[in-house]
Amino acid sequence: MGTALLQRGGCFLLCLSLLLLGCWAELGSGLEFPGAEGQWTRFPKWNACCESEMSFQLKTRSARGLVLYFDDEGFCDFLELILTRGGRLQLSFSIFCAEPATLLADTPVNDGAWHSVRIRRQFRNTTLFIDQVEAKWVEVKSKRRDMTVFSGLFVGGLPPELRAAALKLTLASVREREPFKGWIRDVRVNSSQVLPVDSGEVKLDDEPPNSGGGSPCEAGEEGEGGVCLNGGVCSVVDDQAVCDCSRTGFRGKDCSQEDNNVEGLAHLMMGDQGKSKGKEEYIATFKGSEYFCYDLSQNPIQSSSDEITLSFKTLQRNGLMLHTGKSADYVNLALKNGAVSLVINLGSGAFEALVEPVNGKFNDNAWHDVKVTRNLRQHSGIGHAMVTISVDGILTTTGYTQEDYTMLGSDDFFYVGGSPSTADLPGSPVSNNFMGCLKEVVYKNNDVRLELSRLAKQGDPKMKIHGVVAFKCENVATLDPITFETPESFISLPKWNAKKTGSISFDFRTTEPNGLILFSHGKPRHQKDAKHPQMIKVDFFAIEMLDGHLYLLLDMGSGTIKIKALLKKVNDGEWYHVDFQRDGRSGTISVNTLRTPYTAPGESEILDLDDELYLGGLPENKAGLVFPTEVWTALLNYGYVGCIRDLFIDGQSKDIRQMAEVQSTAGVKPSCSKETAKPCLSNPCKNNGMCRDGWNRYVCDCSGTGYLGRSCEREATVLSYDGSMFMKIQLPVVMHTEAEDVSLRFRSQRAYGILMATTSRDSADTLRLELDAGRVKLTVNLDCIRINCNSSKGPETLFAGYNLNDNEWHTVRVVRRGKSLKLTVDDQQAMTGQMAGDHTRLEFHNIETGIITERRYLSSVPSNFIGHLQSLTFNGMAYIDLCKNGDIDYCELNARFGFRNIIADPVTFKTKSSYVALATLQAYTSMHLFFQFKTTSLDGLILYNSGDGNDFIVVELVKGYLHYVFDLGNGANLIKGSSNKPLNDNQWHNVMISRDTSNLHTVKIDTKITTQITAGARNLDLKSDLYIGGVAKETYKSLPKLVHAKEGFQGCLASVDLNGRLPDLISDALFCNGQIERGCEGPSTTCQEDSCSNQGVCLQQWDGFSCDCSMTSFSGPLCNDPGTTYIFSKGGGQITYKWPPNDRPSTRADRLAIGFSTVQKEAVLVRVDSSSGLGDYLELHIHQGKIGVKFNVGTDDIAIEESNAIINDGKYHVVRFTRSGGNATLQVDSWPVIERYPAGRQLTIFNSQATIIIGGKEQGQPFQGQLSGLYYNGLKVLNMAAENDANIAIVGNVRLVGEVPSSMTTESTATAMQSEMSTSIMETTTTLATSTARRGKPPTKEPISQTTDDILVASAECPSDDEDIDPCEPSSGGLANPTRAGGREPYPGSAEVIRESSSTTGMVVGIVAAAALCILILLYAMYKYRNRDEGSYHVDESRNYISNSAQSNGAVVKEKQPSSAKSSNKNKKNKDKEYYV
């Protein structure tokens, strides 16, 4: 807990403990606490964790005071015992930050008598016993029951540095406690006596006076102030009062006699004011390279008691003030981190003392007086010497040297202010000389008095002065601290010539965990083993921080030594003093007061550094530098961020602030301050970057964001891979590392594929990340065999994550530190591992992604990657962006920049009889399949593999939906893939099918996932060939029952992944059948906006497209031929269509379209009526020159009219009307669509439609003009009239215009009729070239949903409109009308028909007629296909390609053909999709 005020060697502690134990045991001595500020005693740590007790005896007359305290150094747990409330003991403690528990004793103990106190700890309970007559216990309410103890056991008070550092005390209020005044003895822990480790302002007393509270220093004649007069300082030595008169100008036992001869130190305090009684002061200024050297060889010192006095004034924190002696017989007095350090060794170990002020430091540029005394004493028959050091006469520390050697003998030199090599002086805690002023340096013993300052000024022949010393006090320039603000900032220092010996010291302060502080290396030399390639070796020296710990690294050619300088972390924002000293192969590294020795391996003692010494980091251009593998921060690009001050090299100060200015170093600031505000509080990291507080800066972890930059503000480049693409970083030189930081983001739909790997041209060394069965697999192989390691285990592997082939972004992080591995995926728990063997060096020439090209040493090659990579960072280098920006010239790649849709190795199965056979699918225990497909076919077998017994696997399309069928031995199972619509839409779809070892089956189509767990058998035992695209024709009959396929797959397959294997469907095929080609040409002609004229609907098919012209009034392959046209002349005429009585439809939705030209203001064009007595009707009419529709389906008359278009202008117009229940739409030409949504609940069924009347003669408003291309719910009545249909009757003045087109001569009619006669649901993606703007409403973003008639058979229970309120469920499924945005029904898009019952004979006739129609349709379609204009569109997809998302449906190249005048004015933005049933 904190920095101890006394530091001793282990031997000395043991001897001192034995000494004190003897004193305590034989004489019953105790510790006297005078109640002074700064008093304290520290005993060894009492492990009061669980069950333990300690006891002591106490004697006092004080009513208040801190008796005892210990804690966990600033976290949660503590225990405090104080005197309070009239001299009663109060105990408080806490565990795990719980509310402190407190008990107050009933018995006062401040009566001047001895009292026994015992404290018993039992987990959450603590009991206080007093004099065996009182016992009280208390329990703390904490979640944890064990108490944590880190500090020593403090008795009587706390050390000053702990009071000044509140963060190191768990109980902050303990700083304000009054010190204890009285005596304490017989301290025991678990019945065993314990001795104090160190103390301050506390005296050892054999037996306190019975009066209590007194001491020899308080005795004296009545009326006198005490034993020591004239300001003398009293201390108790061997139970006697001893007066220190050195600062008074008096002498004698009680400082009563004026001293006219002997110089004390008191007058020095007045020296600056000239009040020294006229005596000359001997002062000298030292600037770091000067020192005095007094030769003792002629008159060696031999003394048992001696005294050293001096005064100093400085701004420097560290520096040697005085030293004499060598080997194991010396005295060293120095300033260490602003405190006064004394080290004495008389042969049996060092006595060390460190005196610190209560507040601040001694390097405050004020005068301070130091006095060191040593006296030989015989105590209880044991010889020892008591050493006392005091600063300014107040801060005093007392201790003992060992009993074996009590004489200080020195025939060496007295060094003052420094030495030739301070770091090499025995026991020296610092390595640099003093910088400041020293005054009146005096050594005296019983025989000699050496006034060293006077001798130097007077030029005594035994005194040598090194350097130019000014014998007055001058200001010495301070070594200002500097701050390295960024990891890239650094300072270059001159070459360090430290071949045999050397020292470096500095102070640093930071909160950052990593950073290279110092680094230099020597000339490269080649070491060649007979078996292995040449290796470059260098001598080097480095000091670095890793994970908050400070490390020394040194190699003198015989092997590297790596020392952790301190067990605790040093990135807590406090100043730390580092002192490195070496002499040949051995030396020390010390941090503050803790010193760690080292011995370098091998025989070499020469450190040959040829390069500059870098401070704070390394230059960006590292071409000339050689980085040893052991210096991890250099290879990880961790520059130091924090403060540095007081840099001394070989005892010489370095003005690093001035060096930074001369070098114009960016990111170096000439000061050091710690900002109180935490930078991360302002959320500076954008795009969800993780923020960490650094040293006066924020550090953003952008690895999981897809962004780069200091604040994650710059979007990272994406690379797209299609299985044949790669990026390879070919490093300029071979790299050797022992630590790596790797991070990347990936997105893939495949369960297998290489993400990143380091590769070597000379070895099997690799660090590899890959996808393996949907998990991330890390492989590290250090090829120990090649370099002749002692032990080798082979590659280490770690796995992390599950189901990572979900086409989502995932982040992978790898951290290796020597043998330690850590793998993290996203924010999941990190997977850790420890590598076996002695070898830790990774060798690599390349960093590869997508494909491993360096395969010489690979036993198996990982699967190529298909997907996307982003933010690949290796040891701080963002290689993808560096390649893209041209910042490095050693990257090779053919992967595509940017996020692109990936279609890998596409293959076209041009016919349904085409297929390939591959080797058996290996899916015994688990399986991961992936492929992409594009088709316009509803059905087709995609994949089939049979096996032993009934085992098999099938993937097929059924009515546009994907089926996964399998049998593991327990019977066939079917899983239907989930999709919002049929998949035969001529778009690419992604399919992933997997089975894990627990029989969890997963089918993912694009983003929709279906899962199912099956019981029983877990293995899929496949034996025969794997068929892709179909099977032989005769095989379809023998496929398992749950398989629907009767023909093969027609379309494109791509990115086929069979359990990690990427087959070439053509090259790897055992045999092929039918027409199979590379690439994906798709349909030779594809639907475009203007494929069909006059708002015809384009129907995409694999071998082309057809146009549905039913709602256009036009005909022909492209809807640009006139429809069947009749002229109704003056006097009127009428065309009537009558449904057979047993075949009258009832519909929920109707579609009507017709073209016309007229000049009439009033007329009826078309009227549809229901059977007699029902009253349902629909009428298209002209009223006042405007077109309108009226209809009634059982509730009220509903009207809709286009009021803005005048249509009796003699020009040709097309009107389109749709109804869905009571809702309706009306459109004239390309005018906006009019919508009608009547209020209230409406009946929906147009019942039992009987007649269609064209011409309006019966209604008394005969039409006069031209009518063309009438379409109503699948009936082309004018075409049927021209063909003399038996159900058509023509009366009046009606004449057919032009040729008589057949109702089955166009592809549009064929499509419509086939749809009407079909009983299966058929959905096809279509493109409608029409304006969809709605009057009074913004245009909808949804496609117009358009279907052919949905034919439903009505039962006898639903004959009338009574069923409209709650209509019957149809016996065969139908497609529901989609609702538009806002929840309202759309304008009608489908004709829904309910037909009355018909006889069996009628059904047979209908089937025969349908078959005949199909044959005619096929013949005509083939004729038109052979003669149609082939110049529309052509698609040529390469074997491997990545398309832009805007062209993901085939990336076709469009060749426009001439359009009619009407189609040329179409709004090309009006593009929708329609679905046909």
Swiss-Prot record:
Gene3D superfamilies: 2.60.120.200, Laminin (2.10.25.10). Residues 1423-1477 are cytoplasmic. GO terms for biological process: adult behavior; axon guidance; chemical synaptic transmission; gephyrin clustering involved in postsynaptic density assembly; learning; neuroligin clustering involved in postsynaptic membrane assembly; neuromuscular process controlling balance; neuron cell-cell adhesion. Brain. The chain crosses the membrane at residues 1402-1422. GO terms for molecular function: acetylcholine receptor binding; calcium channel regulator activity; calcium ion binding; cell adhesion molecule binding; neuroligin family protein binding; signaling receptor activity. Its main location: membrane. It holds the Pfam family Laminin_G_2. Residues 1444-1470 are annotated as: Interaction with CASK. Ca(2+) 3 binds at residues 1176, 1193, 1245, 1247. It comes from the Eukaryota. Belongs to the neurexin family. This is Neurexin-1.
